[in-house]
Amino acid sequence: MAPPETGDELVFFVNGKKVVEKDVDPETTLLTYLRRKLGLCGTKLGCGEGGCGACTVMISKYDPFQKKILHHTANACLFPICALHHVAVTTVEGIGNTKSRLHPAQERIAKSHGSQCGFCTPGIVMSMYTLLRNKPKPKMEDIEDAFQGNLCRCTGYRPILEGYRTFAVDSNCCGKAANGTGCCHSKGENSMNGGCCGGKANGPGCCMNEKENVTMMSSSLFDSSEFQPLDPTQEPIFPPELMTQRNKEQKQVCFKGERVMWIQPTTLQELVALKSQYPNAKLVVGNTEVGIEMRLKNMLYPVILAPAWIPEMNAVQQTETGITFGAACTLSSVEEVLRKAVAELPSYKTEIFQAALEQLRWFAGPQIRNVAALGGNIMTASPISDLNPVLMASGSKLTLISMEGKRTVMMDEKFFTGYRKTIVKPEEVLLSVEIPYSKEGEYFSAFKQAYRREDDIAIVTCGMRVLFQHGTSRVQEVKLSYGGMAPTTILALKTCRELAGRDWNEKLLQDACRLLAGEMDLSPSAPGGMVEFRRTLTLSFFFKFYLTVLQKLSKDQNGPNNLCEPVPPNYISATELFHKDPIASTQLFQEVPRGQLVEDTVGRPLVHLSAAKQACGEAVYCDDIPHYENELYLTLVTSTQAHAKILSIDASEAQSVPGFVCFVSAKDVPGSNITGIANDETVFAEDVVTCVGHIIGAVIADTQEHSRRAAKAVKIKYEELKPIVTIQEAIEQQSFIKPIKRIKKGDVNKGFEESDHILEGEMHIGGQEHFYLETHCTLAVPKGEDGEMELFVSTQNLMKTQEFTASALGVPSNRIVVRVKRMGGGFGGKETRNTILTTVVAVAAFKTGRPVRCMLDRDEDMLISGGRHPFLGRYKVGFMKNGKIKSLEVSYYSNGGNSADLSHGVMDRALLHLDNSYNIPNVSIMGFICKTNLSSNTAFRGFGGPQGMMIAECWMSDLARKCGLPPEEVRKINLYHEGDLTHFNQKLEGFTLRRCWDECLSSSNYHARKKLIEEFNKQNRWKKRGMCIIPTKFGISFTVPFLNQAGALVHVYTDGSVLLTHGGTEMGQGLHTKMIQVASRSLGIPTSKIYISETSTNTVPNTSPTAASVSADINGMAVHNACQTILKRLEPIKQSNLKGSWEDWIKTAYENCISLSATGFYRIPDVGYNFETNKGKPFHYFSYGVACSEVEIDCLTGDHKNIRTDIVMDVGTSLNPAIDIGQIEGAFVQGIGLFTMEELRYSPEGNLYTRGPGMYKIPAFGDIPTEFYVSLLRDCPNSKAIYSSKAVGEPPLFLSASVFYAIKDAIYSAREDSGVTEPFRLDSPATPERIRNACVDTFTKMCPSAEPGTFKPWSVRA
């Protein structure tokens, strides 16, 4: 049946309302339609590739085959609008709102402090809501599994899980608050105990609470009894019209767009005929692969066929030989069928099913599994597919159909013919897949190693099957299939042939590994890199398979018990997977003093004031601002070369794209093209580009889609120049950004002479992508007169945004108004680098005279905006036999990228934190900023401090080994004391670190657990545990003195309501909430009377960036100052009417012509430091903390599990314990990413490979410590900040180094088992590759690395 000349009508429902779309473009995603056409902006764009879950919605449809309504989550960023025909969509706006009532899924995440920046919150809410629709009484495991496809960069996940635990039927496991104080999960060796009162030190029930004038400790951040109950009967009904429609006979529909035609046939005959007519058409079910190809790889498929309605392609049939799945069956439905089969069939028949289920468990996230088809997974022919090795090793059969009829092919070594190619003919359709039952005497396993367990693509994956001759341990047949070892999924044919007929014993293992090492060879330059690691994994996986089978053979009652060797007891754990235990956590904080007024919220765990709006999708972010009628969209044109001369720019082809308006470049800048913190950057590149992603121009068009297409059509010719990419290359070529900083204290040479030992070494710390969920966004609105322009920007730095824009436009700063309501995360990434986008958008708005908007796609944002500086530290440390440090000489090298930006400040802080928390009498340090051809690196939470301290802990760890002393003892004897001078000669006052250290040692039960770890390691050869306790000392202040200032503006209106404005921006850290708490106490009124609308340059001028963790300090003092001014004016009125209310006093003041508006100002006194003289005071005060972490590693794969973390943190007298604990946990988990997971990978030519969540992995829900305990140090007021508080944003991040060094501790145990005892180098992050390669053993020795310099690597370390 040929498609009609005109398109059909698309009919679907959104939040219960019918939508009829007569003009639909198949290239439009559901996300775009929701946001642009329906104005439903609660659904967010986080990545555009289905990797973050910010766009999660619920899809509901009536299944006529099962005769029931099905609800499932999906990623709206990939879901094609055309796939919604006769489907219902529910978005976060459709389940509850702040005007009427919140749904329990919204209320609980808000009130449990699970929303910080809030950008990810709607997606998480919808994942929870969909789970509740399907399972109103879920288990905790169901809840954790539901979030596999959701990411959060702010919270550290713990409060989200705690809030949603209240839905779980197994939450109250022992009749008490689950995992709170007194829960059974918190008892025993792993409880947060120690110290006084039988393990209740510092907590509720501690003897300290009985003392006079001592406030109590609390572990309750929210009261679950206040939550409204879930009532499943009150959920919206499924549209009856859709049930009626699906029961009717369906007809083929067709939708035509500008470039793509979408045809949805209803019968197999129609589909086969269409595939014959359009042999190159793509079949799409979930669009999870094709959608990414079209957006990120610039692919175009003019015809798309959607087989989702065809009964035969959705059918599931159990036969005598296996289960046959229609090719359009989703992975979730396959999972459901296999799980049922495993539960019902004899276990010997389900070996393959069990392995497939294990692979499916970690296959993407639920949002992808719910829509992605089994057939699509096969036909995509990805060489790193999780399922294809299972299907190949199992001997699965595929049925193909075309106009010529059906044929069945085996999924064997002949099926994949090349990269992304199969034997399937263009006109053929994959109809079904048969996964066979396993036989008696047949065993099957599947393995996968990735950077992250949840929602990650494989590095290497495999399926392994062995069939034994009946009644023996002799191999009849073996199939070993690998992904990630070639351009296709492959079988180790030679190895399989050699193993047939052999007995399953140690000799077979040795020969198999030798054969695999030869057969699974890789070129040192192989795409994907990690060659040594990948080769070793092939052997490690087989070893695991060998042990697993051996174990099953010996346990099989009917098997040849006497014919196989038993598995050695210390090897058994190698066969066990890391399992997920329910999270256990406690948060301890000091309650407010007895007698504090109820309306005084300072010190109370007040919920983030935007949390409810964020949970309902009502909070407005930059790209949520309604579109102007004449608005245009901008897409950047960036360099594809790291270093090159621009020979020509040709935008002529772009002009032919529909909707094209203009192209802007350097010649269109009306003011100065020079920009940047150090005036060493340009708005647009002119003659030379100095990094991939360097902005050359921009295309402006009527829609985002048109501007994207036009931007891709711009042609640029280059003359390539040699780039500098790595720190090592910069050192060799002496490419440094001057000046080079130094600090000297004492006599280093004399210190070395007096030392018993001298240790030299180096450590590299990789960079880190900010991965704020909201990418950079700007909306520029020209006002039409005198060069005025209004900018809505996602920025931490209004002043520089205003200044740089004014410079580019050639107008004074007073013509530019910058507004920021909130950001979807920042972490330093929006302190300066937003300006490279904002100035471009402003120039475009100036040229066109119309509003212009741009929100970067995730891949663009990661490419151009820079991140945390990679560091190399080279050290020489002298120390005594007892571990006491005498002398330190260090050189730090950072990779600054192609401009200075904030690199000097980052290096300054690194130099000032080289000591971490240790008193070193003699110090000499130099800091070099490498100028390279990468996008300029910039501020990131910690701002150089974590890198400086990480290198300190590297030599501290190694010297403890050298001395043969416990690391915790060596660390403690080197800790500062009260009154000591740092290496930059600042006196330590109010030094609480030793209190934090002692309490953390006690509460973590450190010494008892250390003995248990030693015992565990003796009993396990291939799994090892490690533990480490790490301190931190973090200086608080901008190191640029003039930035330590802030302003505020307070307006009081005649009804008594207060409008508060200050110079800080809200990015999820709760700054606005804290400022309202400060104003509330200062004015003596409830927080409900105070409101913050936004931060803007026309209310508070010359604002310092919201950075350096000082924003609450400086803005809080400025707010307090403004409030005190108003109170002083009100004092006479209050005295004359002592019984009056606030409203009475305000009305009287107004009638007496007393100003009810006041500005406030504050500057930090007496800060400033001179590197030349090593004199001054760079910091106002210090924040302190200690963390103890325990991990377990898999020595065979490099995988690791975070078992437990205890943190004790000094935050002074907390302004808001919930926000402060949230910052501690969020920073810690972000640090886990920095030190164990997140790795930026570049080509030798400087091209960034890791441009999205597909290849760049931040921690997910399953990566946080299973036991996570945080305690705020009690009774430690800080006289130097507002209401005795302390900064909290950055200081906790470095504590996650405890995880890194716990991993290193575990690796030491593995190496000792191999007879290797000397200190070793472990660079950061401790990825599975580095962990596995460091656990030297027989397998690693069989896969040696190629000699550096003899090959060109696929990737380099910047």
Swiss-Prot record:
This is Xanthine dehydrogenase/oxidase. It comes from the Eukaryota. Keywords: 2Fe-2S, Cytoplasm, FAD, Flavoprotein, Iron, Iron-sulfur, Metal-binding, Molybdenum, NAD, Oxidoreductase, Peroxisome. Detected in liver (at protein level). GO terms for biological process: urate biosynthetic process; xanthine catabolic process. Residues 8-95 form the 2Fe-2S ferredoxin-type domain. [2Fe-2S] cluster 2 binds at residues 117, 120, 152, 154. Its main location: other. FAD binds at residues 283-290, 363, 373-377, 386, 430, 448. It comes from Gallus gallus. One of its GO terms (molecular function) is hypoxanthine dehydrogenase activity. It is found in: Peroxisome; Cytoplasm. One of its GO terms (cellular component) is extracellular space. Binds 1 Mo-molybdopterin (Mo-MPT) cofactor per subunit.
